[in-house]
């Protein structure tokens, strides 16, 4: 091995190499500087364009020229990466305040990377870029050598507004990343002015001004204010954006999409659900976007009965119509170190940067003014002694020392006199020189006054911030509206909600008819079969069947055959126990309370949802004593309703329905006491059950007789649950009972 070779442990070399690479990526590639809000490549592009004279009023120039200058002079990396960074700064849908004004194909919201090659596009700086460049060259920036040491480039640009917040940025470094969202210029400028006026301003006071991020889209930010506050307090979090939609002629029109969301991709996502039959209520999709309406996506429902609010809620949960954006306010501070900062820290530190920039600008200008005043003093001497000055210049071999010695002027003043052309000497006028002197002395005093007074400096900072906010500011684009969390619909929710009537025959054949105006008994039945029951509901509600053993089953109406035919046997869809038949059928809302009972005198309260069993074999709902039967389920409208029980022997008992327990299944509690011996012999059992509103009147039909029981008469049969009841003569063979309630109409959705 050569003596010149350096021996180094491998682990030390790799550690140092990785650390050096990490620091390079963090400091020189991925993270923005808090002062101008730019990464190095962005800064170099903007500076190179300014050096090419491509300001907002210049003619457009080929983008390849700019990229070539950037790569050749400042940024020795790939041309495609450099051009892509330039494209992003030119896209109004990517940057809140674009830095580059592009001509040609610079991509589209649907496909941001569809931009043309740099040999085809042309560009120049936008008007907004003046905020970063206008004070350059006024002593405001530190300059560093470029990569090959042949020229200088600015270490940062003297931004007049907090561009770090206005345009934001994203980047992935080594071991860290940054995701800074864009904000509204007027809000940020106002917050900065407030912080100058009141240095002790709190974060909450700033958040009254800076409402939240402001993306280059009209989509809504739906994150709650409390969560947004946490983001700006901790410097980390996420916000959610949701598309904006309206109804037009029954269809949904989406007019704004979340940031960087492609309308074409959204339509593909919705179409995929339609192909997979997960959106049966949507009939058609259209993209009607054009130059006048950059975003116009149309979703057409199958009918005007479709709940489009529910459909959109589902699409928000399952497509990019709602999107989350990570926020990580990580940046390189004034100390040169990367750190995650909160909103108050960012604005405070940027104001320190801005204050230093303005101070440097004023000092630079003051130095220029003082130099000019010094020269004017010398020129004034020359004017007052014009003949002697001319004589010295004509006669002396070294006129500069002679002038300095004769008039007591400095070398700079003597050089200024000697550099004047004769025609200028002839035009020198004392009033003109003194006029310029007076103006510059006023400016000098003004500059020195501002530099010496913090109050005057603050006034200047506020004035400049307000002027820039007025010149470049605009209204907020992304409104903040708190919305409920979107939830995807289940298969059950996706079923169309249309009125249907389910018809059951005596032989157990079932069918579904559209609408509620159906003459169920008058339908066509198989030979030997006839009508048994009908129930009305919606097509997206399950229909529940209860068999003679107390088991319950549920079927979606959409799976049932049409009423145009004679239906299908339930045994093809359900697996009933041997010898069991379907006894009852009902459709209600999921939370509707029902009374389930057996003729053995037991019962309980449950909800309709407790009856739903999707499997073929169903589930045990009510436990029946030997030889007992299931009574028809009864709807409970109000917790104050009364339950009236009538036995075969004519005994009546009435008590509050809330005396019964609420169960999901079981035998229940005793409603009315029926002696087991009589029940076993069939001499007695529960014959009738009614849920009555208070103050109801009953008309009981026994043969040709009518027995009317008014509220005061019904009070005689009121007792505790489980009692024997009161024996009412002549009520052993009740044909039917009519209920007259002054408070509400009784349920009439089922026929049996």
UniProtKB/Swiss-Prot annotation:
Gene Ontology, cellular component aspect? chromosome; cytoplasm; DNA topoisomerase type II (double strand cut, ATP-hydrolyzing) complex; extrinsic component of plasma membrane
* Keywords recorded for this protein, A-Z: Cell membrane, DNA-binding, Isomerase, Membrane, Topoisomerase
Membrane topology note: Peripheral membrane protein
Composition bias (Basic and acidic residues) maps to: 473-492
Give the PROSITE patterns listed for this entry.
TOPO_IIA
Q: Where is this region: Disordered?
A: 472-492
Site: Interaction with DNA. Where?
Answer: 39, 75, 77
Q: Does the keyword Cell membrane apply?
A: yes
Site entry (Transition state stabilizer), positions: 119
The cellular location(s) given in this protein's UniProt record come to: Cell membrane
Please give one Gene Ontology molecular function term for this protein.
DNA topoisomerase type II (double strand cut, ATP-hydrolyzing) activity
Q: Which SMART domains match?
A: TOP4c
Spell out the catalytic residues: 120
Catalysed reactions, semicolon-separated: ATP-dependent breakage, passage and rejoining of double-stranded DNA
Question: What is the purpose of this protein?
Answer: Topoisomerase IV is essential for chromosome segregation. It relaxes supercoiled DNA. Performs the decatenation events required during the replication of a circular DNA molecule.
Subunit structure, briefly? Heterotetramer composed of ParC and ParE.
Q: Which family does it belong to?
A: Belongs to the type II topoisomerase GyrA/ParC subunit family. ParC type 1 subfamily.
Specify the protein name: DNA topoisomerase 4 subunit A
Per the UniProt entry, what species is this protein from, by scientific name?
Salmonella typhimurium (strain LT2 / SGSC1412 / ATCC 700720)
